[in-house]
């Protein structure tokens, strides 16, 4: 080690020699150099943040349907630009390919295939205010503004864009329930900020029922609207505080200023308050060059008073520190991302941590600082002992998103499970949610997939909820005779295609959910329930046609649907499958893959059918499935029914084929660019698939006691489990060429089976893959499923 000589070591009374002086000067010069050019720059440079790797634009172009604006983890408010309101391509409000922005709204869904939210549009203007948005083809006709991606940026907790029409810079920041918009105006005698209550993401078919605006003082606005959208009855309030008092303000109703006019009305009409179905507000100013006006905003499903309370509790009245909000949210993201620390390239880190970011955007906190929330019954409830969440895309997220939460987000998973149970308590039909959205059941998709979320959580050690009460909710939901062919399913063992659409898919997904109920019953010592639901869990065989080797629609008399095309995609009354084909759904029996393999003629024939799926040559793109991309033959990674299929190779003793396909999907359908998602992210499911797959294992069968080993895509990961244990994955020799598993060691022991027991994972330890460029066809052939 180099040391700096000390003058104190010179002999007493002896002057330093010339050579000693030279050495001292040289050493001092080196010391000054180190301080000036090494230590000081490091002192001024922040340590790397995991949130620096987040790329919010991923998924905003094409089918991903994500939004670029800021949100706290699982936050209640999501400030983001909207470029359209009427198309499924802008279900999140924003499409990267659009060239103009309608405005900036306070709430957004992430990755869904149906639009909703996009509440309360704010838009700065210069000149005579415009009250209509105009069109994408002619944005100058309205308050839309052109923009360029060269003058747009986004990072964790922050968004910025320059509006080219009016030279206004817009910046957005968001906390959990409140956020801030910062507008930098040019000099103008006619600057304004429009608030449009009629705006929401409508898909051309939804309706604003009622709205209300109130000017609380010369810098505070509150409002409300009731929307009949995807969520049938959605109440939302907002509060906004402006950093600069209004020079002038106007409430507009159907394009006219709300004010007293003795010739038009015989009653006094306040200019400070209005109700109707087409309300807008204009805050008008004279601005100096580069003058900044900020607007603090918050939302509530309860009342305007609660929205103000949410706002003032998160951003106090006197606090206009925009950077403080950005920094606080960025810090929250750093804490969440630190649950998994990885080693890899910049591409690896940006792809992985953006995936975690998307997986942790939803479900959304749905309660005020008071603990109040609007429930399924439209009444006001108080969340006692838990935080209430909403936006449960369960048909998607039961597969990988919630299993991820069970491992590394157990407290939130517990709160989410309690939110599902609260929904059940408030449901007129005594059902757990199917697809819940801000206190509403949308009845979207199929199955009763709150069941695997609860069962997997409980069996993975998630605590804090009443397991017996949860089991009763699961059982009651499954036995409800009025739900989607459930009565016929209970009687016949399948959902008949002459009585119910998407019947084959419903049969298969009900059977899986019943398996999950059985596992919960087993854990609780309820043997009769276990036996009953395990019998129902075997319903796959009831819709498997041996003559075709495929799952097929069957009517109430036991006759197969004719004609039958295993590759046909359909929706509606004549469709037996949900957003998929018979070939794809024929591989869905995750609760008993060995039985499925046996029905298909054994492992060799099963692998042949898997190969045929990937090698299928599609003559024409399937109709009505334009948003389902990521196609490799008839494997469609852009939609959830395919997500587990690659891992089925492992059950048949050929995990090297899984490795090839997994890396193909990762390299072609994920990344760090706006178009890097091949399908709707669906509240994080597409992203959660990547997270698990990159780690080298995947929950093919949630609520089981094992994961399936695949082929890792990152060199090292340290997973901080919710129970405090640390699980480390290492992929030795991993490269773009070395994608095949040669051997595995689990906690130092040779591991020859392609299954990872949860009992091993939960205690922490290490999983070490050795990778190579060619398949090792000996490893993983021991494919007996853990029992």
Functional labels for PLM-detected ranges:
Residues 7-8, 53:
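Ser/Thr/Pro/Gly-rich low-complexity, intrinsically disordered segments
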Residues 9-18:
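Short, low-complexity intrinsically disordered segments enriched in A/P/G/S/L with frequent Arg
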Residues 26-34:
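Sec-dependent signal peptide recognition
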Residues 36-45:
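Hydrophobic h-region of N-terminal signal peptides that target proteins for export
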Residues 47-402, 406-452, 456-508, 516-542, ...:
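Accessory carbohydrate-recognition regions in carbohydrate-active enzymes
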């Amino acid at each position: 080690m180099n040391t700096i000589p000390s003058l104190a070591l010179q002999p007493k009374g002896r002057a330093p020699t010339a050579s000693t002086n030279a050495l001292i000067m040289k050493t001092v010069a080196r010391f000054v150099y180190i301080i000036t050019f090494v230590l000081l720059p490091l002192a001024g440079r922040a340590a790397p943040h995991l949130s620096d790797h987040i790329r919010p634009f991923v998924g905003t172009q094409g089918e991903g349907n994500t939004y670029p604006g800021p949100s706290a983890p699982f936050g209640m408010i999501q400030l983001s630009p909207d470029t359209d309101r009427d198309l499924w391509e802008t279900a999140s409000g924003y499409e990267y390919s659009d060239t103009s922005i309608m405005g900036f709204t306070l709430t957004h869904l992430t990755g869904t295939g149906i639009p909703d939210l996009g509440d309360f549009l704010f838009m700065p203007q210069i000149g005579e205010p415009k009250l209509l948005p105009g069109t994408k083809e002619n944005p100058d006709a309205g308050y839309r503004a052109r923009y360029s991606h060269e003058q747009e940026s986004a990072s964790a907790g922050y968004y910025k864009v320059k509006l080219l029409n009016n030279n206004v810079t817009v910046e957005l920041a968001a906390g959990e329930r409140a956020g801030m918009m910062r507008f930098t105006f040019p000099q103008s005698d006619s600057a304004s900020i429009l608030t449009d209550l009629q705006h929401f993401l409508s898909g051309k078919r939804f309706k604003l029922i009622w709205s209300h605006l109130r000017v609380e003082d010369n810098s505070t606005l509150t409002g409300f609207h009731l929307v009949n959208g995807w969520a049938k009855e959605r109440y939302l309030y907002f509060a906004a505080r402006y950093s600069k008092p209004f020079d002038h303000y106007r409430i507009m109703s159907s394009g006219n200023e709300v004010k007293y006019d003795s010739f038009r009305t015989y009653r006094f009409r306040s200019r400070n308050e209005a109700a109707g179905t087409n309300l807008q507000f204009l805050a008008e100013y004279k601005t100096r060059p580069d003058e900044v006006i900020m607007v603090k905003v918050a939302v509530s499903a309860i009342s305007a008073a609660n929205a103000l309370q949410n706002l003032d509790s998160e951003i106090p009245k006197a606090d206009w520190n925009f950077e403080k909000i950005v920094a606080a949210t960025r810090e929250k993201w750093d804490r969440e991302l630190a649950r998994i620390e990885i080693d890899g390239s910049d591409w690896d880190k940006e792809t992985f941590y953006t995936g975690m970011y998307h997986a942790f955007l939803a479900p959304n906190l749905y309660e005020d600082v008071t603990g109040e929330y609007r429930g399924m019954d439209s009444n006001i409830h108080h969340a006692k002992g838990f935080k209430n969440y909403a936006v449960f895309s369960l048909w998607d997220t039961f597969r990988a998103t919630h299993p991820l939460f069970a491992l590394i987000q157990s407290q939130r998973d517990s709160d989410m499970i309690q939110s599902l149970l609260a929904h059940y308590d408030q449901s007129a039909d005594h059902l757990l949610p199917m697809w819940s959205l801000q206190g509403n059941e949308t009845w979207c998709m199929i199955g009763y997939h709150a069941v695997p979320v609860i069962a997997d959580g409980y069996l993975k050690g998630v605590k804090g909820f009443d397991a017996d009460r949860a089991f009763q909710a699961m059982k009651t939901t499954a036995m409800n005779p009025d739900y989607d062919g459930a009565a016929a399913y209970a009687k016949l063992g399948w959902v008949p295609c002459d009585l119910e659409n998407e019947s084959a898919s419903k049969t298969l997904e009900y059977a899986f959910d019943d398996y999950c109920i059985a596992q919960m019953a087993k854990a609780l010592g309820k043997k009769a329930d276990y036996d009953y639901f395990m019998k129902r869990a075997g319903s796959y065989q009831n819709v498997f046609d041996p003559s075709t080797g495929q799952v097929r629609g069957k009517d109430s008399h036991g006759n197969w649907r004719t004609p039958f095309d295993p590759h046909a995609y359909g929706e509606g009354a004549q469709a037996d499958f949900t957003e998929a084909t018979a070939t794809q759904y024929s591989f869905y029996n995750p609760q008993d893959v060995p039985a499925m393999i046996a029905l298909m003629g054994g492992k060799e024939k099963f692998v042949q059918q898997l190969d045929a799926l990937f090698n299928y040559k599609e003559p024409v793109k399937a109709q009505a499935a334009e948003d389902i991309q990521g196609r490799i033959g008839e494997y469609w990674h852009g939609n959830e029914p395919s997500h587990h299929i690659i891992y089925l190779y492992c059950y048949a003793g050929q995990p090297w084929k899984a490795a090839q396909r997994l890396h193909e999907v990762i390299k072609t359908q994920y990344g760090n660019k706006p178009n890097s998602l091949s399908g709707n992210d669906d509240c994080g499911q597409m992203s959660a698939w990547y997270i698990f797959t990159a780690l080298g294992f995947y929950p093919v069968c949630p609520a089981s006691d094992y994961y399936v080993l695949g082929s890792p895509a990152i060199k090292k990961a340290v997973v901080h489990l919710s129970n405090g244990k640390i699980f480390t994955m290492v992929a030795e020799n991993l490269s773009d060429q070395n994608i095949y598993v040669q051997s595995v060691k689990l906690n130092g022991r040779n591991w020859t089976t392609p299954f990872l027991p949860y009992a091993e994972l939960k205690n922490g330890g290490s999983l070490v893959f050795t990778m190579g460029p060619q398949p090792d066809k000996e490893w993983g052939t021991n494919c007996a499923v853990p029992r």
